[in-house]
């Protein structure tokens, strides 16, 4: 067996795909327990890789879907003695994948995966677009990204990703994972998070473009006052009418306050 630390089960990890293969049985068991896959559910794995999570999930269910960009790995799964007949394999990029094609009536998507860390944030933004059709999502991510997803106002980790994730989903960190659980070991700690989209959004925005804009502008200038940060969009009086203290910093605004600003702007400005 090779002594290289980037070869696992005969497959060399590809840097351009951000591949790190999970190989710690304790961690794998923890993830599968958190997902709790049941027969008949509409399960979708993103980036199954060498099947560390795919195999134990396959022991619990009859059929599920996987999306894999690496052709060699997709081929391996196709020829897998136990999984081959259970899997529907989509070869391609999850960032461009239209998840509506997997929707089944009264059977929402349950999405999971050990996401390549180099695309995890844009991929989550892509997945949020399908929130109405998703029951839950379980992802292995960089621990720092999980901290950002779960952060509260006023903390260093709080940012645009936090606000947009918490707009769509309840966020629950599940499990911390050390680099030694992977081949090759990544240079960062990892963690598993559960994202559960709301049936009814707690603070609905009338136009997501405005919400995205106030988040971007706020977090790009997080140390400025709200008044200075948004002076091209809202006056001090308008902010006060919305219950927002003009002298606070954008990093201290709550999700509800960001949505209130976005909805006011949508009603009173044409989006630029």
UniProtKB/Swiss-Prot annotation:
Listed PROSITE patterns: RRNA_A_DIMETH, SAM_RNA_A_N6_MT
GO molecular function: 16S rRNA (adenine(1518)-N(6)/adenine(1519)-N(6))-dimethyltransferase activity; RNA binding
Keyword list, A-Z: Cytoplasm, Methyltransferase, RNA-binding, rRNA processing, S-adenosyl-L-methionine, Transferase
A GO cellular component entry from the record: cytosol
EC number(s) on file: 2.1.1.182
Descriptive protein name: Ribosomal RNA small subunit methyltransferase A
PANTHER family reported for this sequence: DIMETHYLADENOSINE TRANSFERASE (PTHR11727), DIMETHYLADENOSINE TRANSFERASE-RELATED (PTHR11727:SF7)
Sequence similarity: Belongs to the class I-like SAM-binding methyltransferase superfamily. rRNA adenine N(6)-methyltransferase family. RsmA subfamily.
Keyword RNA-binding: yes
Chain segments annotated as transmembrane: none
